[in-house]
Amino acid sequence: MLNKNLNLAVVFFLTTTSLFVACKKDDNTTTPTVSEAEFKNRSITPAFIKMGSEFSNVGIHTLVSSEDLIPNSGTMVYGGAPDGQGFIKNPDGSGYIMVTNHENTWAISRLYLDKKLNITKGDYIVNTDGGMFRLCSGTMATPEIHGFGPLFLSTGESNVNAMTHAIDPVGAANPSIQTRVKPALGKFSGENAVPLTKVAYAGKTVIILGEDSGNGQVYLYVSNTVGDLDNGKLYVLRRVDQNQIETNMTWNNNYNVEFVEVPNAKNLTGPEMENLNASLKSIQFARVEDLDYRKGSAANNREIYFVATGVSGSTEKTYMGRMYQLKLDANDPLKGVLKIVADGDVSPTGTNVKGTDIINPDNVCVTENFVYIQEDGDSFFPEATHNSLIWQYDIKTGTKKVFMDMTHKDAAFLGSKYNPAGANQNKFGIWEHGAMEDISDVIGVPGTFTINIHSHTWTDGDKFLNPSKAVSVQTYKSGGQTLLITKVPR
């Protein structure tokens, strides 16, 4: 989740190597930087994705899957359900470090890559014992962008007292430690903790968080000391008119909102925080999943997009899911304007679009001009007419296109070890998208992203069980995949 600052790319193809030359503009000077990145299939596993018809020029390159041998790492298994991810330069100058949440095994892996993007070794910096909770989306804070770090923020789910881990991506691996959580960021079943950039609110650290619960909140952590994750205050989002019902917000309307303090949040339990919702009049969303801010200017960085994935059986909540835009006040992060920008239930003109539009949006990746909305359709709502997709939402026009699809129902995969015969084999949404991460500015190649796939039907006995070698074992034993995609519009 990086700021766009690559202005020119000249590409040379030398035999099988792709050499990229990029120029960064800094104070009216240009400093050429050369990327040695090579884009090719590195995994023994075929790609689990395919591009939408309007994006056939996007390159797909497998990076790693659960059945690959990780070099110089013994019997390490890259776990299934790869989700939130961070990608940084290795401080020793040898290449890159990629850290990944493995949602259903409650662990965080770390892979080292050379400058060509070949994986050279790996380990687990958080195992199931240290993870304590399901770990979904995540955000890498860096000094260049956020003013502190590097620090990987991984918010726990699946427990009302879950918290956000703050993990050093370059330090020694102490995977079982349980003391890296940050109580000041609140206790709730969460999805992500996203720090805004250092220019969004100079001199402050502002972090937006989402609660993945049937009565889900949007929280904001604010500290007047950059990088302080222990002594700031926590706030919760509400409408100024204090209407808490999600479906009372409708298309083509702007809603004035504010963040109200959660008193003594650092010392509250999760149930105590939840019990405050009635008195604080916070908006009750249908499971707030991922959040991200718009890249580019400081004003852009105060423009946030988040998704409510939807629940069944409640007229007060979205069913198929929504995406919201939240614009924060330039001078006060506690004030803003909220509106609907995508809705899986009804179109802006009132047409029923259940099952044909977005279905259970789970992750978002926001660039300067687009929002990439990743779906998790494994609630198997009966109206569904498509697989879990990634949609490209155009911020300027408000229109959406299908960016990416899954391959699990293609002839080559049906009946294979990746999607064997079974009750769910032909269901829409049986596979889901994990995080999509913009790594363009890290490697110096514009339009380069990682994308993670939860291939839930792919099991191989117990080969993928307990990949982090923890004492406590989660029963999940499906494989997963991470890919590199290139020439992605930003």
Q: How would you name each of these model-derived features?
A:
Residues T16:
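Short, surface-exposed linear motifs at loops/turns and structural transition points
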Residues M1-V10:
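Bacterial N-terminal signal peptides that target proteins for export
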Residues K24-R490:
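Sequence/structural signature of beta-propeller domains
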Residues L19-A22:
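C-terminal motif of bacterial Sec signal peptides marking the signal peptidase cleavage site
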